């Protein structure tokens, strides 16, 4: 049965502050996490994402603010008394213990009666599909299996929150993709809150109910994977989440409440935005590679599109990825088209002259952060 994200918060971080000597990592940091949610904290190295996780876990002491967990202030509560468990990148399994004993370790530390331990351990192993491995040692398991055991050990205590710190980054690409699906399915089955920290954008988009993007300790955007990808709130988020083309534009006039006429890289066209704009104002028009369209042109053919030439083309199975160099300023544009072998125009030749366009409303329009006009 799929869990339903509940609106009741399981965690509230209120005006949280953490510094190391003179170096402030987060300051006045506020975040509410709902019960049953799969939340990913995403950001580049040094943005503060692991610090936030460690503060929730109790591995770091806050310099200010509050951590509320299921209605209780746990700011000063030691890690071992908080109803959270953490899965680390290194897995941290005990090599001299069997898989069963690794998973049972936390229960024994909590002095759970022996008659309860075996069924709970076997249930946890069953959840990660490794019940038959109970008598093996960690060294006899693959990386993916060790990852699952680390998760089983974390969930056997029935924590209210599971914290995962870059937990899949040590796996190879194929296994990581498999574990992403398994982890999300397990979270649904358990119905507990998962907080996942990663710098991998694709991983965040694949697994999360909600993503927060961090930069220098600040939340740049908080939203669903689709919102983060399709409606980035600023240029940092747009550039950090996947490939994106950023076109320079200048406002000519507002057409109506939804459309603005602008010069976009030499092409006069209407763009959709509700930003308050004035004539001459600089904007950025953002388009994902899959949202850009190409039309092959003869060398002297007239077109209202942005003109460029194919400089690189790569067949990727389902898609053809092309790099277009714009004629007027040599800017490179990435284009991803679904490959159709029956379409004679899909496989472009190098140096082919092309027109670059897009479907109206697919663009994202942001203010030019360097425009001081």
From Swiss-Prot:
It catalyses: ATP + H2O + polyamine-[polyamine-binding protein]Side 1 = ADP + phosphate + polyamineSide 2 + [polyamine-binding protein]Side 1. Its EC number is 7.6.2.11. Its main location: membrane. One of its GO terms (molecular function) is ATP binding. It is found in: Cell inner membrane. ATP binds at residues 43-50. GO terms for cellular component: ATP-binding cassette (ABC) transporter complex. Keywords: ATP-binding, Cell inner membrane, Cell membrane, Membrane, Nucleotide-binding, Translocase, Transport. It is a peripheral membrane protein. Residues 11-241 form the ABC transporter domain. InterPro entries: AAA+_ATPase, ABC_SmlMolc_Importer, ABC_transporter-like_ATP-bd, ABC_transporter-like_CS, Mo/tungstate-bd_C_term_dom, P-loop_NTPase, PotA-like, PotA_ATP-bd. The complex is composed of two ATP-binding proteins (PotA), two transmembrane proteins (PotB and PotC) and a solute-binding protein (PotD). Part of the ABC transporter complex PotABCD involved in spermidine/putrescine import. Responsible for energy coupling to the transport system. Belongs to the ABC transporter superfamily. Spermidine/putrescine importer (TC 3.A.1.11.1) family. This is Spermidine/putrescine import ATP-binding protein PotA. It comes from Mannheimia succiniciproducens (strain KCTC 0769BP / MBEL55E). The gene is potA.
